[in-house]
């Protein structure tokens, strides 16, 4: 376990510990018929995706980063009977699997080895899985009506994008209520890891927002929109998947503990290509960002600051500067260095779609990005950034790059 305290204090400081999730059973269950509802654009070649993801983990480890993988964390978590009970009490309910199958599904999961439990919690349980375990009348009826390939509870292939389900902001974490139903069960699993796993249980950290036992309604939050950039400031995108209802509550919690003095809200349009702030804007160095200008230059910035005289204890102001200028000013910088998506208009649009601006910073001036974004990678290198590349051919089919596929847990501050 890392000796440094849990917490993320910048976007570009030295990364010490990060959580990722390798492709697995959930991805083996993607088909042309179900991938759209599971938020993937296509099926993937899973064995190749696993090799590419292992290469991603290896390249981070070569930089001295502790990389923890979600299947492994979950396996170690469910070895604790109390942790397994906590998960199953919330995941296998009459509302989720039905009264007739509740006991059988629970019996099936409890009868597995911890590694297989982790695989099925992420990979889902099908009618065929249950039939192999116990060919009961309830299972027969389910399979006769819906078919053995139907899911009693569905796979969670988007766990590959660990950035979104929880996000560490300074000395605490949010347990994010996700926008799409296909992703909402992911947060339960990461919450269990933080509650029971030895790396986290007993450690001191705040829960800024979120509770898997609550229905948050319209107050949705996803980590791809959240960036603790340092100097007491947090950037939060407000677009397709993160709502103002959630942003206000996160800001209030941060202000109440003095963890932040300002939240800069980035008003985004709602689109699949720009589903999160980090798909059009990410840090590559202490003062350098890469952006997709077509979207980033149209962001409407607002600033939230603590003010007990205002409704909810928050002062909300629309900024009269551009988003990039507001970010620079919040970090006491005269200006940000900016690398735009590379190529002509067609090439830039393709590279943004392929996560050219969605890079993860390992330390100041060192990022990991996809190999296929050659124009943008070349511009970053010309700006002095070391770009470590990984294969995009399979990992990118869920629309997420290096930033999306990482949940930083310990990251150093940067002195601004």
From Swiss-Prot:
It comes from the Bacteria. GO terms for molecular function: arginine deiminase activity. It comes from Ectopseudomonas mendocina (strain ymp) (Pseudomonas mendocina). This is Arginine deiminase. Its EC number is 3.5.3.6. The active site is at residue 404. InterPro entries: Arg_deiminase. Belongs to the arginine deiminase family. The lineage of its organism: Bacteria, Pseudomonadati, Pseudomonadota, Gammaproteobacteria, Pseudomonadales. It holds the Pfam family ADI. It is an enzyme of class 3 (hydrolase).
């Amino acid at each position: 376990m890392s000796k440094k305290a849990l917490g993320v204090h910048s976007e570009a400081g030295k990364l010490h510990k990060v959580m990722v999730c390798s492709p697995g059973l959930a991805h083996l269950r993607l088909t042309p018929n179900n991938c759209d509802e599971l938020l993937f654009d296509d099926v993937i070649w899973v064995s190749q995706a696993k090799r590419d993801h292992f290469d991603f983990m290896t390249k981070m480890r070569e930089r001295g980063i502790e990389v923890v993988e979600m299947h492994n964390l979950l396996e170690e978590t469910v070895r604790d009977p109390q942790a397994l009970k906590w998960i199953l009490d919330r995941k296998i309910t009459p509302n989720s699997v039905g009264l007739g199958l509740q006991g059988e599904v629970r019996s099936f999961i409890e009868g597995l080895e911890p590694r297989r439990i982790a695989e099925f919690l992420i990979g889902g349980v099908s009618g065929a899985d249950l039939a192999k375990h116990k060919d009961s009348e309830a299972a027969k009826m389910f399979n006769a009506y819906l078919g053995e390939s139907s899911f009693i509870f569905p796979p969670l292939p988007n766990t590959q994008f660990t950035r979104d389900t929880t996000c560490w902001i300074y000395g605490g974490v949010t347990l994010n209520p996700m926008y799409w139903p296909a992703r909402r069960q992911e947060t339960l699993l990461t919450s269990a890891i933080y509650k029971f796993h030895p790396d986290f249980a007993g450690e001191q950290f705040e829960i800024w927002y979120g509770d898997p036992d609550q229905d948050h309604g319209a107050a949705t939050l996803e980590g791809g929109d959240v960036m603790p950039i340092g100097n007491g400031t947090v950037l939060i995108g407000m677009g397709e998947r993160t709502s103002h209802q959630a942003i206000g509550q996160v800001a209030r919690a941060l202000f109440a503990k003095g963890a932040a003095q300002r939240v800069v809200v980035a008003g985004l349009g709602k689109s699949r290509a720009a589903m999160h702030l980090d798909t059009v804007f990410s840090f590559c160095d202490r003062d350098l960002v890469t952006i997709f200008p077509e979207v980033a230059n149209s962001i409407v910035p607002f600033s939230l600051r603590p003010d007990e005289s205002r409704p909810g204890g928050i002062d909300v102001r629309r900024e009269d500067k551009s988003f990039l200028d507001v970010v620079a000013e919040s970090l006491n910088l005269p200006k940000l260095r900016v690398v735009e998506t590379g190529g002509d208009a067609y090439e830039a649009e393709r590279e943004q779609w392929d996560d050219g601006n969605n890079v993860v910073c390992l330390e100041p001036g060192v990022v990991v990005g996809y190999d296929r974004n050659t124009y943008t990678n070349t511009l970053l290198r010309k700006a002095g950034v070391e770009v470590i590349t990984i294969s995009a051919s399979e990992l990118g089919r869920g629309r997420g790059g290096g930033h999306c596929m990482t949940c930083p847990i310990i990251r150093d501050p940067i002195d601004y």
